[in-house]
Design a protein with these regions (language model features):
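Positively charged n-region of N-terminal signal peptides that target proteins for export
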Residues: 1-5
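Mid-length scaffold segments of soluble, non-membrane domains
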Residues: 70, 76-113
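Short, surface-exposed coil-to-beta transition loops
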Residues: 128-132
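Bacterial N-terminal signal peptides
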Residues: 6-16
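Noncatalytic regulatory segments and standalone regulatory/sensor domains
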Residues: 18-23, 115, 136-177
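Active-site-adjacent structural segments surrounding the nucleophilic cysteine of cysteine proteases
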Residues: 14-78, 82, 103, 122-125, ...
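Short beta-strand segments that buttress and anchor functional surface loops
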Residues: 118-123, 145
């Protein structure tokens, strides 16, 4: 039994290191991108506060990931709860709506100048590894996101959809009232 557990944990570790392939994309006419979304590299388990800070500062609400984490980071969950991601910007005077998104919706919102926070799951089998990121661009091959420590990271559409689908396409739109 311990050998089986070791193999499962080893597989989890190896797969988690190679889940998403990304490359820096050259500019093309097909890129839809919001260039002025501030980027905050996340600290450990702080993808929620970093994502919120980027979008809220885009809307000229001066707040840092640390400010946000003080109010909504859950030590027991080692992360941020979805409902807190919605409530926090509302308390700061912004409209925030959580919904089930899709690629067409991402493109429409990016074209309208609305960066979106999405929740993806990089886990496998029964192991969840949820992660918030800010989608700042889309093109015919994938999405461009501020994610973790990567600004403007390209994620191929197939890889993105696979991880986003596991969260039932959780999407958060934040905008001015």
């Amino acid at each position: 039994m311990p050998a089986y557990l070791f193999l499962v944990l080893l597989a989890f570790f190896l797969l988690s290191c190679a889940v998403v392939s990304s490359v820096n994309r050259p500019e093309s006419r097909d890129n839809r991108m919001i260039r002025d979304v501030p980027f905050y590299a996340q600290e450990t388990y702080q993808c929620g506060p970093a994502s919120l800070a980027g979008v809220m500062n885009y809307w000229k609400i001066d707040v840092t990931p640390d400010d946000i984490a003080e109010e909504i980071y859950s030590r027991s969950a080692k992360g941020t709860l979805n409902m807190d991601m919605v409530i926090y910007p509302q308390k700061k005077g912004l409209l925030a709506e959580q919904y089930v998104g899709n690629m067409k919706d991402l493109k429409k919102n990016i074209d309208s100048g609305y960066p979106l926070i999405v929740l993806v799951d990089y886990g496998f089998w029964v192991f969840q590894s949820n992660h918030f990121m800010v989608v700042i661009g889309v093109d015919q091959d994938g999405v461009i996101a501020n994610s973790g420590k990567d600004k403007g990271k390209f994620i191929p559409e197939e890889d993105f959809i696979k991880t986003w689908e596991k969260t039932k396409f959780w999407t958060l739109l934040i905008k001015k009232q």
